[in-house]
């Protein structure tokens, strides 16, 4: 099922910043080009595996945007974007995030107490952003029904599971100076 995702991961360029090897991929970076067949494949896999008995889909700016829009369109479930910009709307919740490579503020709007939500994102690595999102949703009184992330790298998934939440990832990778190594896939057809 994830043929395009696997192939584009295997051929993803690597950029070294300090001691960290970054992979550059259409799903996580929007470059070189996000092909519709890749996005369609990823969203079809999400539809197949996610708990869609929810009121809202929650995603994170920036690369969660195409995922959220596509999944919302496919399922008719409205989506909310956790933004990097403060709007100062009533009920806005600041999300304090710290990752392995950055820290900052994100802002949550449009969640009501009791909303059942599905969180989706492009990548989980340290888990810092996802932890902050979960805490903000809990503070708002939302019920987190499922968490689905396209790409898993590092130990971030474990840190979220320690909070009592399962995280489904479509593909698990490791990255070094030689490239991306695929460690597993949700569809078991990784080779």
From Swiss-Prot:
Instruction: Note the superkingdom of the native organism.
Output: Archaea
Alphabetically ordered keywords of this record: Cytoplasm, Glycosyltransferase, Purine salvage, Transferase
Which pathway does the protein contribute to? Purine metabolism; IMP biosynthesis via salvage pathway; IMP from hypoxanthine: step 1/1
Q: What class of enzyme is it?
A: transferase
InterPro entries xrefs:
HGPRTase-like, PRibTrfase_dom, PRTase-like, Pur/Pyrimidine_PRTase
An annotated GO BP:
IMP salvage
Q: List the catalytic activities from the record.
A: IMP + diphosphate = hypoxanthine + 5-phospho-alpha-D-ribose 1-diphosphate; GMP + diphosphate = guanine + 5-phospho-alpha-D-ribose 1-diphosphate
Cite the SUPFAM superfamilies for this sequence: PRTase-like
Q: Where in the cell is it found?
A: Cytoplasm
E.C. designation(s): 2.4.2.8
Q: Name one GO cellular component term.
A: cytoplasm
> Listed GO molecular functions?
guanine phosphoribosyltransferase activity; hypoxanthine phosphoribosyltransferase activity
Instruction: Give the primary localization class.
Output: cytoplasm
Q: What does this protein do?
A: Catalyzes a salvage reaction resulting in the formation of IMP that is energically less costly than de novo synthesis.
Q: Which NCBIfam families match?
A: HPT_Archaea (NF040646), PRK02304.1-4 (NF002635)
Q: Which family does it belong to?
A: Belongs to the purine/pyrimidine phosphoribosyltransferase family. Archaeal HPRT subfamily.
Q: How does it assemble?
A: Homodimer.
**Sorted alphabetically, which PANTHER family does this protein's record hold?**
HYPOXANTHINE/GUANINE PHOSPHORIBOSYLTRANSFERASE, XANTHINE PHOSPHORIBOSYLTRANSFERASE
Q: What is this protein called?
A: Hypoxanthine/guanine phosphoribosyltransferase
Q: Which gene encodes it?
A: hpt
């Amino acid at each position: 099922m994830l043929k395009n995702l696997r192939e584009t991961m295997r051929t993803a360029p690597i950029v070294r910043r300090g001691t960290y090897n970054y992979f550059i991929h259409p799903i996580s970076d929007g470059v070189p080009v996000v092909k519709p067949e890749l996005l369609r494949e990823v969203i079809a896999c999400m539809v197949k595996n996610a708990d869609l008995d929810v009121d809202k889909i929650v995603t994170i700016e920036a690369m969660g945007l195409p995922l959220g829009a596509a999944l919302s369109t496919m399922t008719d479930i409205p989506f909310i974007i956790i933004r990097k910009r403060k709007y100062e709307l009533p009920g806005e919740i600041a999300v304090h995030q710290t990752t392995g490579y950055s820290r900052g503020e994100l802002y949550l709007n449009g969640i009501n107490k009791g909303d059942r939500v599905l969180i989706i994102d492009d990548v989980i690595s340290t888990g810092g952003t996802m932890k902050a999102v979960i805490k903000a949703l809990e503070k708002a009184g939302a019920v987190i029904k499922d968490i689905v992330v396209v790409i898993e790298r590092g130990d971030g998934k474990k840190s979220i599971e320690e909070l009592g939440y399962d995280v489904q990832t479509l593909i698990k990778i490791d990255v070094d100076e030689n490239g991306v190594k695929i460690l597993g896939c949700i569809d078991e057809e990784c080779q």
